[in-house]
Amino acid sequence: MAVDKLPLLAKFEPVSLVGLVLLSGLFLLLTASRKSDLPLVNGKRPFEFGIAKARQRYLKNAHNLITAGLAKVCNSAGAFRIVTENGTRTILSPNYADDIRSHRDLSLSAALVKEHHVNIAGFDAVKVTVTSDIIQDTVRTKLTQNLLNITEPMSEEATILLKEQWTDNTDWHDVALRPKTLGIVAQLSSRVFLGDKVCRNPDWLRITVNYTIDSLMAAAELRLWPEMLRPLAARFLPKCKKIRKQLEEARDIIQPVIDERRLAQQEAIKQGKPQERYHDAIQWLAENTKDRSFEPAAMQLALSTAAIHTTTDLLGQTVLDLCGRDELIQELREEIISVFKDGSWDKSTMYKLKLMDSVIKESQRVKPMAIAKMARCAEEDVKLSDGTIIPKGEIILVSCSKMWDANVYPDPNTFDPHRFLKMRQPGSDQESFAQLVSPSPEHMGFGFGKHACPGRFFAAAELKVALCHIIMKYDFKVADGCNPQVLKSGMRLAADPFAKIAIRRRQEEVTF
């Protein structure tokens, strides 16, 4: 007989809860890793009895703290520790990027496990990423190999969405930028991940947009509890309950599509007809899993979690960087007209949009989504090439400081839309380095090493499709009275979520 265990929580005596807390604390002490000897840049100050103030200083001023930390250790190890909202982390100079890019004892999966409670119900989208290679295989092979097949459908979706949400109004009118860019990216991504039957489903779009944020908030809620109590606490914490409900809703939306396709395939086999193939992630995941079990809803949410908010942020920042640069917008229009004068989307289209590629890469360089990347957890004590020791259990990140280094980029604090285009001129040996999809220690917008974002080729294609439609179909500028500012919180940087732009429909010179 099934028993609802939730009411049991109310029956715990206070002394029992205290006992569990004490036991969990003892467990942490007994299993704790040995302490790092690296300097701490934002420890407790005099008369501070905890690290709450240190966390506040980190959230408000992480960029300066990391810059100061790198300056302090530049003549020694090039590594230091910093108190974050999730505990103490080790920050490495970008000079270590090659050291750790493929180190067998430094694990991305282990870092995700420590950060995201993957064994608790509701966090299934993270769990399928760290416990299986299906997602990574699907993105690296099927998604990247099918870019030519999915570009035209994304363009069709952009036409539908812009007409509906950006409208054909030829008068200047103000719109909130983030909801507009989020709508584009969510719908274009969903067209690729789930096909045309689901990509415009408002319930799916709501879930796919909200699950990422809600799961991060749920993870933050759980971190307030001792680790041993988190599975119990997750039963009643509001955000944890919310993401479990979203996962169930996702299953209810996706499973009928899978069932319908399975029946159609069985019928085709019965009649001796060829089975219909689909250019979407439902098909690719099924092909990649073969005999392996998988959770379709969790995997679809994993794809959305990885793709939507990151691409939305870069699209929004790029649009803001274009605002007020009318000559640059005209240059981009001329490039688009030149590329599309002889036809539509084909294998060479994305490569030919070199100025657009440079603009996006420069937007990402000036304002990436984080000032430190390459998160890894040491699964053993790790000795780096210069002798620096990373203790077992320590989570490390690599600073992105070379992205603003004057020795790498002249006038690094200035947005130069032609910076990477100039590197791709005939005879240059920087053609590969200068492309948007090329990660390096000098440009870690998509990370670096074997865990560099596997979906960066798709993201680049999606961004270019969206920008082609926006640039050709609309005039746009920052709305009167709006002064967009980068939102900073800890190591995270976000395009101004409250920014408004003024837009008006224009007659495009080419159609897609």
Swiss-Prot record:
Q: How does it sit in the membrane?
A: Single-pass membrane protein
The enzyme's main class, written as a single word, is: oxidoreductase
In its UniProt entry, the species of origin is given as Penicillium rubens (strain ATCC 28089 / DSM 1075 / NRRL 1951 / Wisconsin 54-1255) (Penicillium chrysogenum)
Q: Does Acetylation count among this protein's keywords?
A: no
The EC designation for this entry is 1.-.-.-
Q: What's the main place this protein lives?
A: membrane
Cellular component aspect of the GO annotation: membrane
Protein name from the UniProt record: Cytochrome P450 monooxygenase adrA
Cofactor(s) needed: heme
Q: Which domain of life is it from?
A: Eukaryota
Annotated residues for binding of heme: 453
An annotated GO BP: terpenoid biosynthetic process
Instruction: Report keywords, A-Z.
Output: Glycoprotein, Heme, Iron, Membrane, Metal-binding, Monooxygenase, Oxidoreductase, Transmembrane, Transmembrane helix
Q: Which of this chain's residues carry glycans? A: 86, 149, 210
| A Pfam family that the UniProt record links to this protein | p450
**Which regions span the lipid bilayer?**
12-32
Q: Which GO terms describe its molecular function?
A: heme binding; iron ion binding; monooxygenase activity; oxidoreductase activity, acting on paired donors, with incorporation or reduction of molecular oxygen
Instruction: Cite the Gene3D superfamilies for this sequence.
Output: Cytochrome P450
For this chain, the family text in UniProt reads:
Belongs to the cytochrome P450 family.
Q: Which InterPro entries match?
A: Cyt_P450, Cyt_P450_CS, Cyt_P450_E_grp-IV, Cyt_P450_sf
Q: Where in the cell?
A: Membrane
**Pathway(s) served:** Secondary metabolite biosynthesis; terpenoid biosynthesis
Say what the protein does.
Cytochrome P450 monooxygenase; part of the gene cluster that mediates the biosynthesis of andrastins, meroterpenoid compounds that exhibit inhibitory activity against ras farnesyltransferase, suggesting that they could be promising leads for antitumor agents. The first step of the pathway is the synthesis of 3,5-dimethylorsellinic acid (DMOA) by the polyketide synthase adrD via condensation of one acetyl-CoA starter unit with 3 malonyl-CoA units and 2 methylations. DMAO is then converted to farnesyl-DMAO by the prenyltransferase adrG.
